[in-house]
Amino acid sequence: MIFEIENKTIHASDAGQGIDPKKQTIVFLHGSGLSHIVWSLTEQFFSNKNFNVLSIDLPGHGNSDGPCLDTIEKIADWLESVFKKLQLKNLILVGHSQGCLEILEYAFKYKSRLNKLVFVGGSNRMPVHPDLIELAKNGDSDAVKLMMKWGYEGSKKFIGGNPVEKIIQSPRDISEVLAVDLNACNLSLIHI
């Protein structure tokens, strides 16, 4: 699914099903530096369980035009623009890592559209070590390696390694996307 918000092309996956106004919608929000791809299998599962699914590439991520939004608060406001444009309500929001901060902020500001929140690997605070942010700003691939080590220690059990490492590869992805996301997590306001 491709649409425009604020004159920027936005990509979201709907598992090829479209949005049926009679069904409840689950929106999946990716973590720092990632894209809708991380939700591919999950969205297929839930689309087969009679839900609308929507995995959104945030601005500057995946196939969506940039630049990245530099605060969690701006992302929450942007999400409201998306949900208004697509006429979505009674939402189940699922956030992974940074996505958890986004759904918390969204719930604080726009709870009337919500039905449920689901948190995957996140919390209400995500302080990020300044050295990790600096590595990311410099486009250093060690930033991704450290994230995988700290966040996915069991990833050595995956055949071929953790697939997330393959999503964030180029120095541009690291310096222009991951660094902005990590800084946004670090600066996030806490409302609960």
Located regions from the model:
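N-terminal cap/lid segment of alpha/beta-hydrolase-fold proteins
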Residues: 1-9
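Conserved HGGG/HGGXW glycine-rich cap/lid loop of the alpha/beta-hydrolase fold
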Residues: 11-65
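Structural signature of beta-strand start/N-cap positions in the alpha/beta core
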Residues: 25, 52, 89-92, 115-116
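Conserved alpha/beta-hydrolase "nucleophile elbow" surrounding the catalytic nucleophile
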Residues: 30-32, 91, 95-97
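Catalytic nucleophile-loop/oxyanion-hole region of alpha/beta-hydrolase
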Residues: 66-75
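Conserved acidic catalytic loop of the alpha/beta-hydrolase fold
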Residues: 74-91
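Flexible "cap/lid" loop of the alpha/beta hydrolase fold
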Residues: 101-144
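Conserved alpha/beta-hydrolase catalytic His-Asp/Glu region
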Residues: 134-189
